[in-house]
Amino acid sequence: MTNAIDELQAIIAELKTEVEEQRAVIRQSRDRIEHMSAEVVDSNPYSRLMALQRMNIVKNYERIRDKTVAIVGVGGVGSVTADMLTRCGIGKLILFDYDKVELANMNRLFFTPDQAGLSKVEAAARTLTFINPDVRIETHNYNITTIDNFDNFLSTITGDGTVAGEPVDLVLSCVDNFEARMAINAACNEKCLNWFESGVSENAVSGHIQFLRPGDTACFACAPPLVVAENIDEKTLKREGVCAASLPTTMGITAGFLVQNALKYLLNFGEVSDYLGYNALNDFFPKMTLKPNPQCDDRNCLLRQKEFQARPKPVVVQEEAPTDEPLHASNDWGIELVAEDAPSDAPTDLSQSTDVGQGLRLAYEAPEKSSAEATQAATAPVDDTSLEDLMAQMKSM
């Protein structure tokens, strides 16, 4: 009996190993593409993106392949953000998360039920690589808020850019807790890295994105939420069996705003919003800019503020408004444009209008009124004869 149990356990272990090996296999949808092409063919995944150049929206879209973006938090907003950037052809993505995929996550976008049990970064990397094998995916499965992991996070975002030893081009915060946001804020203030913060409310009907430039705009510690300002432990706020609401629509909209502004920043087109909110109840989209707090608790934020104030201010060159010059300076024929509602001084009788420019003559003269028109224009004489008298006159004829 013991031998049979041992054999069954060995078979189970072998099957588990085979399953893990199969799950570890990363599917590849196509071969890598060396250069983006604007050729409009069904086999070109970049033709619609490169059309932005033809329409003068982006000068050189292929520059996106030289960009590295770090995404912290691969949940409802972060996974969709990674998906969008991958489809846009970003050069490199660095994913940070320590959570696992659960069936409770299926109300959100991106993840599938067969990925339950996998780490979020691992599941995301496999799907993203299958979507676009041209994008390099780097994963880190740890909590960035611990001391050791924070140092690893700091070294990664400052040295794992597209070029070895260079910082990432942008950090995107898609986490769902203030502790992680403060960790990202501290790292970006210390290394003077621009980053976007994003979030969705607990009732799932509002979201926001915020662009933070150390020293120029308010950092996350300049105006902290109450839970941070009062040093409250977030874990004590969550009751057992109670969870925040989650709508894939709100998360998709927030992720769309986040990626849209990230692309504008990376490819230098359009205007990047410093703060953009969204209220789903009345479709309200507030925009604002938050100035840094001179009494911020983050010493690196205060240092960046001093550095920013010491920088020479960019000189704004005011372009002269173009003057409305006539398209054709010479007007030999005396032609003028008259507004439709302008009173006309021209005579109504064309036969009297013979004042034409030099070198022109009338093709014909307007005819005089015919005798028929003159007869119609004449006024009939007034007669007091009654209808009975007229009938009698007609019968006598």
Swiss-Prot record:
InterPro entries: D-isomer_DH_CS1, ThiF/MoeB/HesA, ThiF_NAD_FAD-bd, Ubiquitin-activating_enz. One of its GO terms (biological process) is protein ufmylation. Residues 343-384 are annotated as: Disordered. Zn(2+) binds at C219, C222, C296, C301. Keywords: ATP-binding, Metal-binding, Nucleotide-binding, Ubl conjugation pathway, Zinc. One of its GO terms (molecular function) is ATP binding. It comes from the Eukaryota. This is Ubiquitin-like modifier-activating enzyme 5. E1-like enzyme which activates UFM1. The active site is at C243. Pfam families: ThiF. Belongs to the ubiquitin-activating E1 family. UBA5 subfamily. The keyword Nucleotide-binding applies. Transmembrane segments: none annotated. ATP binds at G76, D97, K120, N143, N177. GO terms for cellular component: cytosol.
